[in-house]
Curated annotation (Swiss-Prot):
PANTHER family: TRANSMEMBRANE PROTEIN 180. GO terms for cellular component: plasma membrane. This is Transmembrane protein 180. Keywords: Cell membrane, Membrane, Transmembrane, Transmembrane helix. It comes from Gallus gallus. Residues 1-10, 74-98, 150-153, 222-259, 321-325, 389-397, 478-509 are extracellular. The gene is MFSD13A. It comes from the Eukaryota. Pfam families: MFS_2. It is found in: Cell membrane. It is a multi-pass membrane protein.
Amino acid sequence: MGLRLLACLFHLPTAVIYGSLSLFVSILHNVFLLYYVDTFVSVYKIDKLSFWIGETVFLIWNSLNDPLFGWLSDRVFLSTQQPGAEISSPEVVLKRLRALSHNGPLFAISFLAFWVAWAHPGLQFLLCLCMYDSFLTMVDLHHNALLADLAVSAKDRTSLNFYCSFFSAIGSLSVFMSYAVWNKEDFFSFRIFCIVLAFCSIVGFTLSTQLLRQRFETDGKAKWDQESTLKELYIEKLSVPQEKRITLVEYLQQLSRHRNFLWFVCMNLIQVFHCHFNSNFFPLFLEHLLSDKISVSTGSFLLGISYIAPHLNNLYFLSLCRRWGVYAVVRGLFFLKLALSVVMLLAGPDQVYLLCIFIASNRVFTEGTCKLLNLVVTDLVDEDLVLNRRKQAASALLFGMVALVTKPGQTFAPLIGTWLLCVYTGYDIFQRNPLSNVVSAQPKLESDTILEPTLRQGCFYLLVFVPITCALLQLLSWTQFSLHGKRLQMVKAQRQGLMQGRAPEIKMI
């Protein structure tokens, strides 16, 4: 039985195994996003100064580690070479799989460090965030880079992304299961739950990467034997020019001239900000806009569905991408976000059912857009390769440079959101505890009753004006992005030509 199961796993399509890696990230990361702030604020009682110091250091490290790890991984690919040099090979894929097989289990172990008090809350908060983000960055960089390395055509990349969304949706079920064990007064059951999740993630990373490595090691060995003979003939007959090594400064200069990259990161910075704004303030909106109008189970359902629906919705968006292209779908989602926000603003905060739909759909469509943008980055990888005639696509490095510019949006979201709320209403999350009862209606103190109308109005304005502003700025940036239509087809054709460019040289020899 065990051998038959292993045989079935070995014959799974590459896209399925690649997509399954998203499952082993999402089962942990969704739980982390939902509970880490509440754990340190409500359970470990971190003070306000330590919290902001930790977030500030995390902002810096979170922005720098993506390009740093990307540069360390892909700097050897930046050298230029004569036309006809091979662009993609099993060795590149194997390098990324080895990185995933090492960093995946370490990522799962770092996840466990949050749920046991082992140091001063401020120190533990800082160390846990930086350690967790480091391993998550390594996993994300190489997993995303494989999307560009395993396929070139939009159809194949869409298929890979489809399975990522499918498995991410399954991984989001961990959020629903966590409700059964989450108890700030008794952490034992939640800790056991997290240990089980981490163990599943470790086993999954190990098994999936091993299956993919076996598959590409077989292909790589055959290809290596063939290339060794061809290189000997090539060296005997022709002199090969020395490769030109690209320094970091030269690479940054190349990126600064990459017009589509610049417009994309401007748009994506706003998108990352909006995604994390929704995640950070979703519980607050539920508490102060809906808690006295909906039941606890309804609030929990809205919170849970907001985590799983983006992945399921993305399966439909990907089918639209196959038909209309990623650019058109993303532009349509920006217009949809703007239209829904304007309708909600005109309707006002007293339309309960419309408010429920808007709060949930705002997060679902925003997260869905984020998940499509990896396809755009892979197109930028192709354009970067063609424009700069690289011998190999520096996929992880370009994903890292995108993150360098856009990841500050993760930290700006809670900072700007809490600042706007405090300026408008005088509400301070460190003096009150809005997360102590996210979706339930408890008896309010007299001071709370006085503050509630202003706080409710402030939450509503944040809810509608942030997406309106984001949508307008994103549409402005996205209209300047030209890597779609005929230009994208031309870039794809040139990269395919480079990949097949060795064949004419062999015939000449």
